[in-house]
């Protein structure tokens, strides 16, 4: 029974914030399947250290297993062939008592959620109908990324390379890479134009950025790679950049530079380049020491429901080809999301292997903000329109448990809104600089990129 929970407990975990998915009754997760009767539930059983206990009752074992494997996090690690890795993961789930957050930690998570949600709402208000491919519904991604970078800094990581498509990119740029809000507002207003020196002229949700982030006195250089609209095409580019950075850092152990790839659920399961990158991940000439994959699983691919988009239960199933552990987590529980990021980062740093976080959330608006999603998913969007935002869910949880006051929550939201108002006011006069000719590239000078066409033989 204990083994069944380790293998299949995720199938009845509370992973869907919309509660659209109904869990099946699984006989192997019930004591009756193993010959136990109701009157046996309070009898002591000798466990010999299994679940880190010598003796326990059936009732206590069930409570323990359901808490660890069937709450807002579901784990898949029993498919891992390496017994050391499998035991490490099992002990981390069952024995480690680190799924706890201090008052300051909870406030830090809340503040990142306020930034993520407040930024999307502000753009939605100021630039109605403008494409931004918002993160609305998946805002827990932001505190998760913060956690990965923070742990990386504590582990003396020098650089983090991030690759992602357009969904949520502006939010990551602003609230993780610290690209100024006024610059993004300036781009929305159409004030920034491509010059003959930069030759860019790309849409704002394709652009990259880089910055130095400091956590607890540790500095980490974080960069987000530019990408095209072609989903997952950026993956091999990020992995190649990571490998090159490791070379220049003389990082033979692959622990100074780590890649993070952020995927959509439909693209992760459907795009062949994902499987190709997994297939090459263990090769000596291509190995980067493991990638942290985060699937922003909003349970829809443009207008396609999951049951019409893939043949496997989860979009993450393709990762089992390389024995990658998979952590499924409910996006409406930001503490669980941050904890999942913590485990994933620790696993990658210890074993130098790929790991996947399946962040199950939803997409509050259409594929882009000009679409009306209720035409193709009427039942889903009826549910979404009445569903509270992550800030409301988590903020009320903290107020209820006494971690913060209602006034503190409202003041934090207002303070961030005031900051955005100030940035919006100054956006029109913002003067950008060509940042990609700095640092290592400072000895190179931009050439004119004005289009020139050679005369053809017919001219």
Regions found by a protein language model. Name each.
Residues 1-141, 157:
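Extended, charge-enriched "interface" segments that sit outside catalytic cores
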Residues 306-309, 323-353, 361, 365:
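Conserved phosphate-handling catalytic cores of large alpha/beta enzymes
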Residues 452-459:
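Conserved small/polar residues in nucleotide/adenosyl-binding loops
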Residues 215, 314-340, 386-407:
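Conserved thiamine diphosphate
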């Amino acid at each position: 029974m204990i083994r069944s929970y380790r293998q299949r407990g995720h199938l009845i975990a509370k992973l869907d914030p919309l509660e659209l998915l109904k869990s099946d009754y699984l006989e192997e997760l019930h004591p009756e399947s193993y010959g136990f009767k109701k009157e046996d539930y309070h009898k002591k059983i000798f466990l010999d250290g299994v679940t880190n206990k010598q003796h326990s009752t059936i009732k206590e074992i069930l409570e323990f297993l359901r808490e660890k494997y069937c709450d807002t996090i579901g784990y898949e690690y029993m498919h891992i062939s390496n017994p050391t890795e499998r035991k490490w993961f099992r002990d981390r789930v069952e024995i480690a008592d680190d799924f706890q957050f201090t008052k300051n930690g909870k406030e830090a998570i809340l503040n990142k959620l306020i930034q993520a949600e407040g930024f999307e709402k502000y753009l939605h208000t100021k630039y109605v109908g403008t494409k931004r491919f918002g993160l609305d519904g998946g805002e827990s991604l932001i505190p998760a990324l913060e956690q990965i970078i923070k742990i990386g800094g504590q582990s003396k990581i020098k650089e983090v390379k991030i690759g992602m498509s357009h969904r949520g990119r502006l939010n990551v740029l602003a609230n993780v890479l610290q690209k100024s809000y006024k610059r993004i507002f300036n781009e929305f207003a159409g004030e920034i134009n491509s010059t003959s020196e930069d030759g860019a002229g790309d849409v704002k949700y394709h652009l990259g950025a880089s910055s130095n982030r400091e956590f607890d006195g540790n500095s980490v250089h974080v960069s987000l790679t530019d990408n095209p609209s072609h989903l997952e095409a950026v993956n091999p580019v990020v992995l190649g950049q990571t490998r090159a950075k490791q070379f220049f850092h003389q990082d033979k152990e692959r622990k100074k530079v780590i890649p993070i790839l952020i995927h959509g659920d439909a693209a992760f399961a459907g795009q062949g380049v994902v499987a190709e990158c997994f297939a090459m991940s263990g090769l000596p000439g291509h190995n980067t020491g493991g990638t942290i994959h985060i699937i922003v699983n909003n349970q829809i691919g443009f207008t396609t429901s999951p049951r019409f988009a893939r043949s496997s239960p989860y979009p993450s199933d393709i990762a089992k080809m390389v024995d990658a552990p998979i952590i499924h987590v409910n996006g409406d529980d930001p503490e669980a999301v941050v904890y999942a990021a913590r485990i994933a980062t620790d696993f990658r740093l210890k074993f130098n292997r790929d790991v996947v976080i399946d962040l199950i959330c939803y997409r509050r608006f259409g594929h882009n903000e000009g679409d009306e999603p209720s035409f193709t998913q009427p039942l889903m969007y009826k549910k979404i329109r009445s569903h509270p935002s992550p800030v409301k869910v988590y903020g009320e949880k903290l107020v209820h448990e006494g971690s913060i006051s209602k006034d503190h929550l409202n003041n934090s939201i207002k303070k961030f809104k005031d900051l955005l108002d100030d940035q919006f006011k100054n956006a029109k006069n913002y003067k950008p600089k060509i940042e990609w000719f700095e640092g290592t590239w400072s000895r190179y000078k931009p050439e004119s990129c004005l289009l020139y066409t050679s005369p053809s033989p017919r001219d």
